[in-house]
């Protein structure tokens, strides 16, 4: 079977795979016209944003739809700015847009790769802020009804790296636009690592933005130079009792208390202290500066990356008794699959 359309430039790992058909859409009407017939005929279909959260392990036996819709509109009332953003907008460029227009609240989320439409799917987050903190609503194309529907932030069922779009609406919805609500009374979020040195009464949104960009640029490789998907593993969440037990064995373990009493561990710390920082397996490796990032060292296949990920998961479990979970979607011949080799 021939797969004539290369996906190499459409995934940030730079994996060389192809697909049967590749279509770009720039409006909601185009999206409906393309996606609904494919869905109704049960043909394999993948809706792709920036390709920064995906690992292709095989050629894709179906149609890849790239969402390139653009547009940002802003309204306001006494307390909030309200933004409506089309799904194809670049996330980091949106962060820059808000700061340049004197709207704060997204600065902690600077330099997260990908598009706005992908952001709600895994409830993106960094440095103490998650999308759910500033999301107002999400609009999506319901593939069963063919209608454009809107969910409130509560209806999105957000949790850590999860949403209704990874649950009940998986493969049944295509996000078309996102609504954000940014408070005019700004409260800096400074609880995480490199932001703790700022003073809450003097720090500005631009200060936080620049620090986040600086830290991410130092630790995260440029995917144009070294293929990667950013953080490959979720930070595991364990019970307080399990954390106390681990802390007795590993006094320097990094953990963050959660509102429900659980503790979120730093997956990068676990990987590094399992001896895997800089580890290489075939053409894939654990990044030497940030152990949470897996990289394509040249000509890695999706299988190479999955093999390395499984090795990391097994090693961390052997050392700490903690099971890591991959963040990116794993795409096989006919659609999404599990992490395997």
UniProtKB/Swiss-Prot annotation:
Keyword Cell wall biogenesis/degradation present in the record's keywords: the answer is yes
Q: In which pathway does it act?
A: Cell wall biogenesis; peptidoglycan biosynthesis
GO molecular function, a single term: UDP-N-acetylmuramate dehydrogenase activity
GO biological process annotations for this chain's record? Answer: cell division; cell wall organization; peptidoglycan biosynthetic process; regulation of cell shape
GO CC aspect terms = cytosol
Q: Which residue ranges does the record assign to the FAD-binding PCMH-type domain? A: 15-185
Residues annotated as catalytic: 161, 231 (proton donor), 327
Keywords tagged on the record: Cell cycle, Cell division, Cell shape, Cell wall biogenesis/degradation, Cytoplasm, FAD, Flavoprotein, NADP, Oxidoreductase, Peptidoglycan synthesis
Which Gene3D superfamilies does the protein's record reference? 3.30.465.10, UDP-N-acetylenolpyruvoylglucosamine reductase, C-terminal domain, Uridine Diphospho-n-acetylenolpyruvylglucosamine Reductase, domain 2
InterPro entries, alphabetically?
A: FAD-bd_PCMH, FAD-bd_PCMH-like_sf, FAD-bd_PCMH_sub1, FAD-bd_PCMH_sub2, MurB, MurB_C, MurB_C_sf, Oxid_FAD_bind_N
Q: Which reaction does it catalyse?
A: UDP-N-acetyl-alpha-D-muramate + NADP(+) = UDP-N-acetyl-3-O-(1-carboxyvinyl)-alpha-D-glucosamine + NADPH + H(+)
Q: Which HAMAP family match?
A: MurB (MF_00037)
Concerning its family, UniProt says: Belongs to the MurB family.
Q: What is this protein called?
A: UDP-N-acetylenolpyruvoylglucosamine reductase
Q: Which organism is it from?
A: Shewanella oneidensis (strain ATCC 700550 / JCM 31522 / CIP 106686 / LMG 19005 / NCIMB 14063 / MR-1)
**Gene responsible for this protein:** murB
């Amino acid at each position: 079977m021939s797969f004539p359309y290369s996906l190499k430039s459409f995934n940030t790992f730079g994996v060389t795979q192809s697909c049967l058909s590749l279509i770009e859409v720039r409006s909601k009407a185009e999206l409906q016209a393309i996606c609904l017939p494919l869905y109704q005929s049960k043909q394999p279909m993948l809706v792709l944003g920036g390709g920064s959260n995906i690992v292709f392990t095989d050629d894709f036996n179906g149609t890849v739809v790239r969402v390139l819709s653009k547009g940002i509109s802003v309204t306001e009332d006494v307390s909030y700015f309200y933004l409506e953003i089309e799904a194809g907008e670049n996330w980091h460029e949106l962060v820059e847009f808000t700061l340049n227009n004197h709207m704060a609240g997204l600065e902690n989320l600077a330099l997260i790769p990908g598009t706005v439409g992908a952001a709600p799917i895994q409830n993106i987050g960094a440095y103490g802020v998650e999308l759910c903190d500033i999301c107002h609503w999400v609009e999506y194309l319901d593939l069963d009804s063919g209608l454009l529907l809107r969910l409130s932030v509560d209806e999105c069922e957000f949790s850590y790296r999860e949403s209704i779009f990874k649950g009940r609406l998986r493969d049944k919805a295509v996000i078309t636009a996102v609504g954000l609500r940014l408070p005019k009374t700004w409260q800096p979020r400074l609880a995480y690592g490199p932001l703790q040195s700022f003073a809450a009464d003097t720090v500005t949104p631009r200060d936080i933005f620049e620090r986040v960009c600086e830290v991410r640029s130092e630790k995260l490789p440029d995917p144009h130079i070294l293929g990667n998907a950013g953080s490959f593993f979720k930070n595991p969440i364990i019970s307080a009792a399990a954390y106390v037990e681990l802390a007795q064995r590993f006094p320097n373990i990094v953990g963050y208390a959660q509102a429900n009493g659980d503790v979120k561990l730093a997956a990068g710390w676990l990987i590094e202290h399992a001896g895997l920082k800089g580890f290489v397996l075939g053409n894939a490796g654990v990044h030497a500066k940030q152990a949470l990032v897996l990289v394509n060292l040249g000509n890695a296949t999706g299988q190479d990356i999955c093999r390395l990920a499984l090795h990391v998961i097994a090693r961390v479990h052997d050392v700490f008794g903690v099971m890591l979970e991959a963040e990116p979607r794993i795409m096989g011949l006919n659609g999404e699959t599990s992490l395997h080799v």
